[in-house]
Regions:
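A short acidic, glycine/proline-enriched capping/turn motif at secondary-structure boundaries
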Residues: 2-3, 38
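Conserved beta-strand segments of alpha/beta enzyme cores
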Residues: 14-16, 30, 121
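Short acidic capping loops at alpha-helix termini that bridge into adjacent secondary structure
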Residues: 12-14, 28, 87
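Cap/insert and terminal regions of metallo-dependent hydrolase folds
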Residues: 3-7, 73-126
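Core dinuclear metal-dependent hydrolase active-site scaffold
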Residues: 18-84
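Short, acidic/turn-prone active-site loops that include or flank metal/cofactor-
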Residues: 1-2, 19-23, 94-95
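A residue-identity detector for tryptophan
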Residues: 8, 20-21, 52-55, 100, ...
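Helix-loop-beta element that forms the nucleotide-linked donor phosphate-binding surface
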Residues: 4-17
Length: 126
């Protein structure tokens, strides 16, 4: 993904490629990519060539979780155990379809993921 961002004009000095659970910090704010259940690809030839992720954002005592596109998984409980509880969770919902059970969540799954994370406030997104 880093090469693609650089090709789009993002300065290489601003690009950081991370694996799940690998932390980075910017201006005192910690960013951690966490597990997600999805796939990647922009063209017919690059399927699953980059890692998908959720995001854990920590600023002092404030904790925010951003799910990104994801299906429900045990990863939410793992994230909650490692980084929770969260003040705010931004949870993917609304792109659900019977054909996409593994990569998007039904509303009740989004709520369960929020609870697994130990979330206080939930903002449904897509």
């Amino acid at each position: 993904m880093g090469d693609r961002l650089i090709a789009w004009g993002v300065p290489a000095s601003k690009v950081r490629e991370l694996a799940w659970w690998e932390e980075t910090e910017e201006d005192g704010i910690r960013f951690v990519p966490g597990p997600a259940k999805h796939f990647s690809g922009r063209t017919l030839r690059d399927g699953n060539s980059t890692q998908w992720a959720s995001w854990i954002i920590v600023d002092g005592a404030t904790r925010v979780f951003f799910s990104g596109d994801t299906g429900y998984s045990a990863g939410f409980r793992q994230i909650g155990e490692r980084y929770g509880p969260f003040d705010l969770t931004l949870m993917e919902t609304g792109a659900y379809d019977a054909r996409w059970p593994g990569v998007h969540m039904q509303p009740e799954e989004s709520l369960q993921a929020h609870l697994d994370l130990g979330g206080k406030w939930m903002l449904p997104i897509h």
